[in-house]
Amino acid sequence: MTIERVLEQLRVPNRAIFCTDGVEGVEYLNENRTMLPAIILLDINMPRMNGIEFLRLIRNDNDFKRLPVVILTTSTEERDKIESFELGISGYMVKPVDYDKFVEMIQVIIKYWRLSEFPQEE
């Protein structure tokens, strides 16, 4: 099952956009500030701009600071994981990813994101 299909099944708002590297991802976000993704799935190992550099850039922009980011990577480097969490990621999974755990993680993150973006009135 593809990531796009999983997001569709979970009713994640906005469509899935696939960028080949961090530079393309930053360009997409900058060009689409009025329709930001509900979640970003990111790899550490990407050409031109790696995932850590991408995270640093988006976390320094007020429009992108709170976007939930999940790392899906082959990197088993502990420093990558620590630095990613220090930069505010919502989840980290090493490939190959267990489908059920992935779905569960995305469900929890999207639920939390929706609650934080649209708090219930008391």
Outline where the language-model segments fall.
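His-Asp phosphorelay/catalytic-motif detector in bacterial-type signaling
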Residues: 12-13, 35-39, 63-68
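Acidic, metal-coordinating helix/loop segments flanking the phosphotransfer/catalytic sites
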Residues: 4-5, 18-39, 103
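Receiver (REC) domain active-site loop signature in two-component systems and cognate sites
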Residues: 46-49
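Short, glycine/charged-rich "phosphate-handling" switch motifs in NTP-dependent
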Residues: 90
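Active-site residues of response regulator receiver
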Residues: 42-43, 73
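Conserved active-site segment of CheY-like receiver
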Residues: 71-76, 96
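C-terminal output helix
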Residues: 97-110, 116-122
